[in-house]
Amino acid sequence: MEHPGRIVVVSADIGAGHDRAADELAHRLRARGFAVDRLNLLHLLPHPVHRVVRETYRGVLHRLPWGYHALFRLTGSSQTAVRAIRALLRPFRRHLRRRIPPDTRAVVTTYPFANQLLGPLRRRGRLRVPVITYVTDFVVHPTWLAPGVDVYCAVRHAETHQASAADVTAVQPLVSRAFTRTGPEDLRRARQRFGLPAEGVLALVVAGSWGAGEVAATVAEVAAAGVRPVVVCGHNAALRHRLRGAGRHVLGWVDDMPALMRAVDVMVENAGGLTCQEALAAGLPVVTYRPIAGHGRANAAILARAGLSRWAATPQQLGPVLAAVIGTGPVAPSRDDVSQDPAGLVAEAARRAPPAGPAGTRRPLLDPVGDAVAVLAALLQSTGGLR
């Protein structure tokens, strides 16, 4: 049977949240009959550059969090900084356009910098199909915004950054239906599966796929509060090695997070991204503690304001907050039955759109000049050379 159209989903392997959202969207769209292509934005870069970009970002997050926070604030308050990023990415627009098949009916992004490439292509008429983005954070930061993007989607409690004026469509979270809260028997089986104690209160400590932030301090302080921590270190082997011992339950990368969330009583997190959306969908109480710089702190504030999590701002607050959350027991799963399924929104847009058609085979003669000028202007703007 002929499929109703092709949809391209663009993500990036910066952490795991962007890819997990893209995976779930692709799953839902395929269930609706669409052909789905997945693109990793960083694969547009030459392989050594791809690795350098990813590892530099990881290094800054781990070793220079103040630098990451400063960049997050700069791009949040300065349109010039966002335009500079867009200009620096301009040389890769054509390469991305050529990766979009002619029968594509819509392009969806789950990574902000993809919008800085696709938005201009759409605005200039080089991409005829709608560009839709799903914001994986609770804060819609200006780096997600680009002229030409048709629809911005975010979960219901998300907030636009103070410098943003975007019109955002509230949608259901892109988390697997497997994130559900079940009964005591499922808890027992889940604990047995992961080798966890059958009795006692367990706190799941998560820090993203890179194990970023003050994880060791968090683990020690959760234990000092009388709650046994279960730590997920993701791909951070060094962190896992450092935390092992003393009867701790320390895991690396976990494929079946729905099962692990059924095994614990509370989650302590520091980033507020997709894992937070998954915990809320599963009805697992969430405590934010020692949030990482940039988006972590911004998400923490929004989650606390919305009443979706409790933010323990100091070590002295952690124990009472954990006791209060655990004392109330499991919470009702945060299922949004009012907002639209993002897959339905994308499917509707794709059915109305004409096919993308072929990418231009000839590069306009002035494009290389424009690329060079844009990059030079971006560099001058970022250093204050243009006023």
Regions found by a protein language model. Name each.
Residues 304-307, 313-330, 352:
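C-terminal "capping" alpha-helix adjacent to the active site of nucleotide-linked donor transferases
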Residues 24-99:
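Conserved N-terminal ligand/cofactor-binding loop architecture of enzyme catalytic domains
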Residues 185-264:
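Donor-nucleotide binding loops and adjacent catalytic segments primarily
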Residues 21, 77-161:
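Active-site and donor-binding regions of nucleotide-sugar-utilizing enzymes
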Residues 151-201, 207, 234-236:
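A nucleotide-sugar donor-handling region in carbohydrate enzymes
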Residues 327-387:
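C-terminal amphipathic helix plus adjacent low-complexity
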Residues 257-298:
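A donor-sugar binding/catalytic signature common to diverse glycosyltransferases
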Residues 4-45, 104-105, 110, 119, ...:
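Soluble, non-transmembrane catalytic domains of enzymes that act on hydrophobic metabolites at membranes
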